[in-house]
């Protein structure tokens, strides 16, 4: 019987290099790309070869550990200067996913008091491995909590890919499908194709099929009709940043689904680890939304489909107001109701 173990890992540490599952080649080619320096890591994030907020944080952590091994520094002060430069450099790759900055800050903090280069290099490698290992445990816990929201046979709509290949393992929004299969609770996924890069059509369908989980692909425009005619029971999505009041940035089109859930009276869940929360921002209006290249919209797999010179608005994310969210599922449990109070309480513990 197929399980999540059949799904390739998104990021693997090789000691002197990083292997990333090249998600731009999926579903037709399963290819690992070798990253050997910090510039490779930056490009891999920008080009969406590695994607998903937790996976971006993981590859950034490994990227910093890798870079630190190669510094030509004569003392710890010069080492720290080079390290901080690379931290700032990686932070310019993708602005919306807060896990990137969380991982960078965690790596930076891990060597703040270290006095020798050799020890700093050792600690950075260990910390990056811990970040990856912790994410796998966290995602499994998210899946356990999320599964309590569903019952055997439920049809659940999702968008983008918040699955195993977007994390260390299991995923966030897709975690209950994997945990459910382990426990004999069969859930059926309806995956929005997720234009313009088709993360749902290319990635979510691919990884769920790898694990022998029922999945039906729909166009983004079909969501309302599918909810009505296919008796969708709930919607679950991942997140790239959740702020203090519960407002959530996620893949463009998520807000559409939240509005549809409200209209049709079905639950709308967000699944995310605590590392995706940004308590420095009070509302979603403060979130910087990444805008990507116009060719993602004007071309499909390299073929021009729109008239040349057509203006394009191509935000990668939108923000769903907290009042449209039924529950935020974390590794610590499910938040419901007064998100600001619950989130504040979580981070005070």
Curated annotation (Swiss-Prot):
Active-site residues, record numbering mapped to chain: 240 (proton donor)
Gene Ontology biological-process entries: L-methionine salvage from methylthioadenosine
Residues the UniProt record annotates as site (Transition state stabilizer): 160
Catalytic activity: 5-(methylsulfanyl)-alpha-D-ribose 1-phosphate = 5-(methylsulfanyl)-D-ribulose 1-phosphate
Coiled-coil residue windows: none
Listed InterPro entries: IF-2B-related, IF-M1Pi, IF_2B-like_C, Initiation_fac_2B_a/b/d, M1Pi_N, NagB/RpiA_transferase-like
Keyword Isomerase part of the UniProt annotation: yes
One function term, GO molecular function aspect: S-methyl-5-thioribose-1-phosphate isomerase activity
Gene3D superfamilies, A to Z: translation initiation factor eif-2b, domain 1, Translation initiation factor eif-2b, domain 2
Binding-site positions, substrate: 51-53, 94, 199, 250-251
Key words of the record: Amino-acid biosynthesis, Isomerase, Methionine biosynthesis
Pathway: Amino-acid biosynthesis; L-methionine biosynthesis via salvage pathway; L-methionine from S-methyl-5-thio-alpha-D-ribose 1-phosphate: step 1/6
UniProt xrefs under Pfam families: IF-2B (PF01008)
Keyword Isomerase: yes
Enzyme Commission identifier(s): 5.3.1.23
Function: Catalyzes the interconversion of methylthioribose-1-phosphate (MTR-1-P) into methylthioribulose-1-phosphate (MTRu-1-P).
Family: Belongs to the EIF-2B alpha/beta/delta subunits family. MtnA subfamily.
Subunit structure, as described in the record: Homodimer.
Protein name as catalogued: Methylthioribose-1-phosphate isomerase
Species of provenance: Bacillus mycoides (strain KBAB4)
Gene name of the record: mtnA
